[in-house]
Amino acid sequence: MLVPMSEGDTSELDHDADHLAEGDERYLLRNKRQIRGLLQQLIDQRAVVTMHVAGRDMAVPTAVLEVDEDDDYVILDGSHNDASNRAIEQAKYLLCYAQLERVNIRFRLETPERLERDIHVAFRATLPDSLYHLQRRESYRLETPITDSPTCTIRQDAASGGNLNLQLRVIDISSGGLAVSLATGMPLLEPQHTYRDCTLQLPDSAPIALPLTVCSQYKMTLPNGSEGFRVGMQFSDLPRGADETIQRYIFRVDRQRNARKSGVF
């Protein structure tokens, strides 16, 4: 299933929005104090939250406005688009993505309630029971060079949920996954879906065929100043030798950067 940037498709999401990739349960927080603290950090850092609306294939940029510690609820900003606000109001749940200091955050809000705050629309929901906070500090993530970047091709046929053939720039990569950028007008990818027919092309290496699972998706400003989306994807099942190839690429680029900084090259 594809998720267009235009907000209007009414097809049902057919995935379990709370599904975590294998081994990710250790990053699931259930302590209310910790959850409130992270949501408050989203407010303090004015972080953009990308909200996926259940029952509609749409992604709406928003922000956390308030966290109530007494009644355990959270308030999120509404959209300037009336149709989007109606869809949010009617949703059974909202699946929200954000980043704090380059660490992915994901949480689910049940049955949002519409509020009118002055002239602005907002939505209140009960504090999430759990929050996914992916602190994979042990996995070094390399920001790829703007020139001679790796590319990732993501394909899907109609039988698997919709025709898709995207060749995207890889903006960062680690031994556990990669991130690609989607420009305005490109279809968004389905959260938590595994795309089986993908190809990673590293410079000076043979193409690597592999499946990729969508872990996060949020709005960002691209290097050219336009708005787009950053999509974080996990390596689901690397073929033999691929991990070593990726690690060699990361080491080589990192070594070249350090050499330039020290004036060696």
From Swiss-Prot:
One of its GO terms (biological process) is bacterial-type flagellum-dependent cell motility. It is found in: Bacterial flagellum basal body. One of its GO terms (cellular component) is bacterial-type flagellum basal body. Residues 135-252 form the PilZ domain. Keywords: Bacterial flagellum, c-di-GMP, Nucleotide-binding. InterPro entries: PilZ_domain, Split_barrel_FMN-bd, T3SS_YcgR, T3SS_YcgR_PilZN. GO terms for molecular function: cyclic-di-GMP binding. Monomer. Interacts with the flagellar basal bodies. Belongs to the YcgR family. Acts as a flagellar brake, regulating swimming and swarming in a bis-(3'-5') cyclic diguanylic acid (c-di-GMP)-dependent manner. Binds 1 c-di-GMP dimer per subunit. Increasing levels of c-di-GMP lead to decreased motility. This is Flagellar brake protein YcgR.
